[in-house]
């Protein structure tokens, strides 16, 4: 044989070969046939077991024998893949109705591997034989196997709609399928209604076939998703576990899971829930136990006393496979091609297959009945001239001669003559003559009935309906999955996710934030906080891990940070910079921080800028679900900075102090509530080149402490302040000097909580007691504290 060498481009060869491969795995491996709901390997397994007599009424046989038969005759692939497919057909948590019964370890819902095939035994289930019934009556086409040594069926007769009953899942080149299992009785009832009315709508079909019926039970939510899937082949539903509540003797409650979503690994689910408990992602779970035994699936989740079990359940629905979404993708092979099919198309394809199967079976039975009728007529004729027939046979030389003589003398046909010469003597009694005449009548009636079925389409459909009803009556079972119309919205209480713990929140002027246990704080003291050189504590307070921190910056933005998301860091150690939690700009600095326990409050924030703008916004506006980026708190115009954020429970007085020593005091009731993106209104009427250095709440018992650039501190009492209206110029608090005038660089309202001050110059920090600063009159410049000739001008002041 001479070689033929072709020059082909690699691109063409790869494209051609991959196209062939794709077609093969689509048609011959991964996708089920719409007619019998089986993939090729599943079909070959069932047929091999049936043809070898490994049926439900016989003894179990070693699985290895079946696997050997399949790969030897029909499926030349690895034995493991065949055994794996065989095992799946026996798993009652995968199939709604198992097609193979298996003795031995056939795996588990924990995804444990089955025992080796040499240890397990199997046989066809009774229902599986309904897929194969009448296969020997020329009902389906056969094709040569892979080595042309025998024949295998292209499809099984499938006397019930197996694709819908047991569903299918698979992935091939460019296609995937996910068809859920359904209740057999419901599917058959829907098929019967479709036979009666081929124009039946999906809505009408759904009166009979309610939705998927998973072997693992569970609760299905979302009728709209089911309807969409039944109409188009694609849809989405929610499947959640069945969870009940029990009360233990000690008064604690426990959640008992008895049904889990389809295809969920039970051991992985238990492990996941226990991880959520161990990692303290959910507070309130004491222990998770897998109590599954021979009586059924059971997972126990023991809860702490007085916890909200409904919230725990909702958290687990959202954060574990206690609830999953199932996506329909009903792709099957139809007319040799993969198609996305709705439920009407699937039932229609199945019905057309059954029409063909029943018609072929009827033709086969009619042919056999007519052949038998012909033989019976010959036997009856022979018995009517028995003596002559016997005499002719006795005078014949041999069997062949006898047959030829019968045909020639009495005009019997070849088939009739063969039956006569094979007739045994004991059959020549009167009883057998009567039996033959009775059989003749029965055959006449049968032939008439079979011809009627072939000639009358309605009669053929009635046969299909009768046989489907028989299967329904024999194999029907109660629905396992409960269907709920709406998808329930999951609401999770924060208390469930986060253990309640009182901690110390701290923020430094350079933006380092942390939470610290009260134990660590008490062991160290405020002064021992971990700081970088040049940094100082801006604020510290006791908060709860279930609170939320709002961090406000000079750009008019705020960061929304749940306290429990802050790193738990010892008091003596450096905190975490806010930019590592939420990204902020390089020149963006923190100006204040507050914690909120409940955003449902009448409290409000007041924002004041350097250029004299002010606004008020209620606390509920700041609640959000976005943690990953800064959010707008107030609009800050170009060349301006937010310098003050205050939180008030009710309207009160605020004082504004400017760089040139002007002061204006008015009530926040003059401010209207505005949205977060508003810029606000004018707070004070500034002089040229003046700017605001302080805006803070003030009361009658407070004093004001001011620092000037020349190192002077001035302290005044509340009575010097004159309450006025917003947007006025205000009063003067400094004595104006022609040469080197004092300018206020920092000011703070001093309350009973404050006792110390710190002045910052370019190269020095000066600490002192606030009470050592005597109260001044309105038109003075205070007392010199810092020698600016030695340490430079004062740039800031901090009180504590």
UniProtKB/Swiss-Prot annotation:
GO terms for molecular function: ATP binding; DNA binding; DNA negative supercoiling activity. GO terms for cellular component: chromosome; cytoplasm; DNA topoisomerase type II (double strand cut, ATP-hydrolyzing) complex; extrinsic component of plasma membrane. The keyword Cell membrane applies. Its EC number is 5.6.2.2. The record marks 39, 75, 77, 88, 94 as: Interaction with DNA. The active site is at 119 (o-(5'-phospho-dna)-tyrosine intermediate). It is found in: Cell membrane. Residues 31-495 form the Topo IIA-type catalytic domain. It is an enzyme of class 5 (isomerase). InterPro entries: GyrA/parC_rep (IPR006691), Gyrase/topoIV_suA_C (IPR035516), Topo_IIA-like_dom_sf (IPR013760), Topo_IIA_A/C_ab (IPR013758), Topo_IIA_A_a_sf (IPR013757), Topo_IIA_dom_A (IPR002205), TopoIV_A_Gpos (IPR005741), Type_II_DNA_Topoisomerases (IPR050220). Transmembrane segments: none annotated. Heterotetramer composed of ParC and ParE. Phe-80 and Lys-84 confer resistance to fluoroquinolones. Belongs to the type II topoisomerase GyrA/ParC subunit family. ParC type 2 subfamily. This is DNA topoisomerase 4 subunit A. It comes from Staphylococcus aureus. The lineage of its organism: Bacteria, Bacillati, Bacillota, Bacilli, Bacillales.
């Amino acid at each position: 044989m001479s070689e033929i060498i072709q020059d082909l481009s690699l691109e063409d060869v790869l494209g051609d070969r991959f196209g062939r491969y794709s077609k093969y795995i689509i048609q011959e491996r991964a996708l089920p046939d719409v007619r019998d709901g089986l993939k090729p390997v599943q079909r070959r397994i069932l047929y091999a077991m049936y043809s070898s007599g490994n049926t439900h009424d016989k003894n179990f046989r070693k699985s290895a024998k079946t696997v050997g038969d399949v790969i030897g005759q029909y499926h030349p692939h690895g034995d493991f893949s065949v055994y794996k497919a065989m095992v799946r057909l026996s798993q009652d948590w995968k199939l709604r109705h198992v097609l193979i019964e298996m003795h031995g370890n056939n795996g588990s819902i924990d995804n444990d591997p089955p025992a080796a095939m040499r240890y397990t035994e199997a046989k066809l289930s009774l229902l599986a034989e309904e897929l194969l019934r009448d296969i020997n009556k020329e009902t389906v086409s056969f094709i040569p196997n892979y080595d042309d040594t025998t024949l295998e069926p292209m499809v099984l007769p499938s006397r019930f709609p197996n694709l819908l009953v047991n569903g299918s899942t698979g992935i091939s080149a460019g296609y995937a399928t996910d068809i859920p299992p359904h209740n057999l009785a419901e599917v058959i009832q829907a098929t019967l209604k479709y036979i009666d009315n081929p124009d039946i709508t999906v809505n009408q079909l759904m009166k009979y076939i309610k939705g998927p019926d998973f072997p693992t039970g569970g609760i299905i939510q979302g009728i709209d998703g089911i309807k969409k899937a039944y109409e188009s082949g694609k849809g989405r539903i929610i499947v959640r576990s069945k969870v009940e509540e029990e009360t233990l003797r000690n008064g604690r409650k426990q959640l008992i899971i008895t049904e889990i979503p389809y295809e969920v690994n039970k051991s992985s689910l238990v492990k996941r829930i226990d991880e959520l408990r161990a990692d303290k992602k959910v507070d309130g779970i004491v222990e998770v136990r897998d109590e599954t035994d021979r009586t059924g699936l059971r997972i126990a989740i023991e809860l702490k006393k007085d916890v909200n079990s409904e919230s725990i359940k909702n958290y687990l629905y959202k954060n574990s496979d206690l609830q999953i979404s199932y996506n329909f993708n009903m792709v099957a092979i139809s007319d040799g091609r993969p198609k996305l099919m709705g439920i009407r198309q699937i039932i229609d394809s199945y019905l057309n297959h059954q029409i063909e199967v029943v018609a072929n079976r009827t033709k086969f039975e009619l042919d056999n009945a007519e052949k038998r009728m012909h033989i019976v007529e010959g036997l009856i004729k022979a018995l009517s001239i028995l003596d002559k027939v016997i005499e002719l046979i006795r005078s014949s030389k041999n069997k062949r001669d006898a047959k030829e003589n019968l045909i020639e003398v009495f005009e019997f046909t070849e088939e009739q003559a063969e039956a006569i010469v094979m007739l045994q003597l004991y059959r020549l009694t009167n009883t057998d003559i009567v039996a033959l005449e009775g059989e003749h009548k029965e055959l006449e009636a049968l032939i008439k009935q079979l011809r009627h079925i072939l000639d009358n389409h309605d009669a053929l459909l009635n046969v299909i309906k009768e046989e489907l009803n028989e299967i329904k009556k024999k194999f029907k079972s109660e629905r396992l999955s409960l269907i709920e119309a709406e998808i329930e919205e999951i609401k999770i209480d924060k208390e469930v996710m986060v253990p309640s713990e009182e901690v110390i929140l701290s923020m430094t002027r350079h933006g380092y934030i942390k939470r610290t246990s009260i134990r660590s704080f008490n062991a160290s003291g405020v002064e021992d906080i971990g700081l970088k050189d040049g940094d100082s504590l801006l604020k510290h307070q006791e908060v709860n891990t279930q609170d939320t921190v709002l961090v406000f910056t000079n750009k008019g933005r705020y960061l929304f940070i749940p306290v429990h998301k802050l790193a738990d860091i010892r008091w003596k150690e450096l905190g975490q910079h806010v930019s590592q939690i939420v990204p902020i700009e390089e020149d963006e600095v923190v100006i204040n921080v507050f914690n909120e326990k409940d955003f449902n409050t009448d409290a409000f924030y007041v924002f004041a800028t350097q250029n004299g703008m002010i606004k008020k916004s209620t606390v509920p506006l700041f609640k959000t679900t976005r943690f990953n980026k800064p959010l707008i708190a107030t609009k800050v115009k170009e060349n301006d900075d937010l310098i003050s954020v205050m939180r008030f429970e009710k309207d009160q007085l605020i004082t504004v102090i400017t760089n040139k020593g002007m002061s204006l005091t008015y009530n926040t009731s003059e401010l209207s509530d505005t949205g977060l993106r508003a810029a606000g209104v004018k707070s004070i009427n500034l002089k040229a080149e003046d700017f605001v250095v302080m805006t803070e709440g003030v009361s009658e018992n407070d004093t004001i402490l001011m620092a000037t650039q020349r190192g002077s501190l001035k302290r005044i009492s509340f009575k010097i302040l004159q309450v006025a209206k917003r947007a006025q110029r205000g009063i003067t608090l400094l004595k104006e000097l022609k040469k080197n005038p004092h300018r206020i660089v920092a000011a703070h309202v001093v309350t009973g909580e404050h006792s110390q001050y710190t002045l910052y110059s370019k190269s020095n920090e000066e600490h002192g007691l606030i009470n050592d600063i005597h109260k001044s009159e309105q038109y003075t410049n205070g007392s010199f504290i810092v020698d600016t000739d030695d340490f430079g001008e004062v740039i800031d002041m901090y009180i504590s």
